């Protein structure tokens, strides 16, 4: 039975920066949390808050969960990761993900084509930058270096980073949902950031993870809700699932809906999307199976949560990433999970 590490999941900002997020990260470090994670969508970025947190902490690892590929070129992402790694004393975890077509094409103005090939090429270039063995070059087709296409002056040449990386093996994680993308993470990355994972359905991902190298990490976000009313405690998870399965993505291509279908809830996923897209959002949440919401979260009295943690310890998951609104909640979560 493996020990589980604990991470603090801060996510991305809503309309304004959340009050006290640095103090929360400091408290997480004091409590023995292993990592703190930020994210980005189409508002706040993932890297700047980590720099702010890193300046006020000493040990806790700093992860992006995730940086979107289309937000930056591979070399720009490598520069930011190297810089943060130096400033934090070697605590950076670079989490990367393709996002989805609505954000990539609607916010970044870039095509979403060939996400797997783009990811492989992107990470390959970052590895070149970090190794610093020779000037960085790539034949493309997604990120050709040097660029020689339309509009080029023909003066570009392969370059080697001026800065020497603190760690040539700076860990790179991938956010991935589809079987091929998860298999790619196992092949080329150092860790995986799933969206949903059920400790009772390890077979959903077992084939995709079969080629993971020793030391491969899996950091899974999980909602922890300590309550005596399990049904009521599951409502926020059901609302979240209704949003993602029903509305996060196009009707004809929703990666979250496809994942829930692979987990054994295809008919339910179809119904959730149908209700959500017709404006019946509350009904969509009520259509989320209690079994699904319960499996991917830790809800109930402390004794029940500790009992269900045993199932998580039998999985390949290495870290649970949790959220908290204040230091009191954080201390309770640390006691329940780390003290189990």
What is each of the regions a protein language model found here?
Residues 1-340:
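Active-site-adjacent structural elements that line small-molecule/cofactor binding pockets in enzymes
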């Amino acid at each position: 039975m493996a020990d589980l590490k604990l991470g603090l999941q801060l996510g991305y900002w809503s309309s304004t920066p959340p009050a006290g997020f640095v103090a929360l990260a400091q408290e997480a470090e004091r409590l023995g949390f292993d990592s703190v994670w930020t994210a980005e969508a189409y508002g706040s970025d993932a890297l700047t808050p980590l720099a702010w947190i890193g300046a006020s902490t000493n040990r806790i690892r700093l992860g992006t969960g995730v940086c979107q590929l289309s937000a930056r070129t591979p070399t720009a992402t490598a520069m930011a990761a190297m810089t943060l790694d130096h400033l934090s004393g070697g605590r950076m975890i670079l989490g990367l993900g393709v996002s989805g077509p609505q954000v990539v094409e609607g916010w970044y103005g870039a095509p979403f084509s060939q996400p797997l090939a783009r990811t492989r090429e992107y990470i390959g270039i970052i590895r070149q930058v970090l190794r610093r063995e020779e000037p960085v070059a790539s034949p493309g087709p997604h990120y050709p270096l040097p660029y020689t296409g339309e509009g080029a002056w023909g003066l570009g040449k392969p370059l080697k980073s001026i800065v020497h990386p603190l760690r040539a093996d700076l860990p790179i994680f991938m956010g991935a949902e589809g079987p091929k993308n998860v298999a790619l993470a196992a092949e080329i990355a150092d860790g995986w950031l799933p969206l949903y994972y059920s400790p009772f359905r390890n077979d959903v991902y077992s084939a995709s993870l079969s080629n993971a190298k020793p030391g491969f990490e899996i950091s899974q976000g999980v909602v922890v809700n300590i309550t005596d009313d399990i049904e009521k405690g599951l409502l926020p998870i059901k609302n979240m699932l209704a949003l993602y399965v029903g509305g996060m993505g196009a009707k004809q291509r929703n990666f979250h809906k496809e994942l829930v279908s692979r987990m054994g809830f295809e008919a339910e996923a179809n119904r959730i999307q149908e209700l959500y897209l017709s404006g019946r959002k509350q009904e969509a949440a009520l259509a989320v199976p209690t079994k699904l919401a319960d499996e991917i979260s830790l809800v109930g009295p402390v004794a029940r949560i500790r009992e269900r943690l045993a199932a998580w310890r039998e999985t390949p998951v290495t870290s649970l990433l949790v959220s908290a609104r204040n230091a009191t909640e954080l201390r309770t979560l640390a006691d329940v999970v780390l003290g189990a």
